[in-house]
């Protein structure tokens, strides 16, 4: 173990012991200390689900990237393991950037982007991003002594050799494949496909997909590629997108393409892109397939456009609740992993409750809850809910029936900087909004609309004493409400 990795492990152990768990999410992965962003290496190995992540343990800001490490058996209760990687080699001294993991010959293999800096003729330095591997046993990892295994110089002419990062690996038959985010010489985002027979000798295969229209941002970060039902799915997180109506917002997005893939010719014919999440805090998703066949996705529950936390908080960054993916009606539907139901306690239910003007319902409150609201067809035109609320704080969700539009507003959630606080989304179902399922976990609200046809994720900075939930309707409406507290076993 290098001195740098040993130092990081010692530091995080000391800081974790000094951190009050009440200041952190109850059932979401969060930074053990310092900063985390992209999920990495989401995989099943040796009977456990492993999640790594971009990690700077020493303060709350992005810095030289390490890989943090957590494991779980049910995706609700997570165990913190020691940091897995540190930027301690010449080829990754500027950071161990994002990547993925796979099991091979009994070993847990991490594939990541090592960043180094090359001196230029004018004396300046320029980043170089190359792909590297490390072999481990689920806790300790040894970097391959001939890293990097693939460099930008191995890409064909026309490919950018500076931005070449975030490998996602899988195996088909007897061949390993990885897709890597890239740009072409005109700064247009694309994903390249590479292959290997042995994990150490890689070659370029093809450009799997690119931003031909020029409308899907610039660099395509954190790509993922997998089968879901009858379709192949490409996920990526484009930088610097322009807003497109209510589907995509300005800045960093996470999108998916459905399509058909020919494994022999490595041709992916993609359909139109869709947003994966319509909230304000969702980026760099990564998926894995569990032994039971479920495709599970997790993402960074923050955004480069809105990284705001209270000054009193000594950590920065958390992940979404893992979500089950399903292909339905030509789109990806998402639902919270079913394991959350094992932690349901203290149920509270209302059937056909009448709402007219603003009101509360006894027992319907809390900050670690699973809350479902069914809207009945009624006279209303505007229906709204305020969560994590009291006289000073609130995060509101307002449905405008005539426009079939949902407006999310966290202006009064406790943020102290001028970041994105309002977002509108068009409800996909032409029959309107029928069902809302909220997952609250102290610093976050995840909203699953119409059984997961759309999802909106929002981080909040609200003090925990703001526990109330308010309901409002401009005219009479009847709702069914079901709330469970979430209590860890």
Model-derived segments and spans:
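Beta-rich carbohydrate-recognition and catalytic domains
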Residues: 1-166, 171-216, 227-278, 301-350, ...
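Beta-rich accessory regions
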Residues: 9-15, 254-489
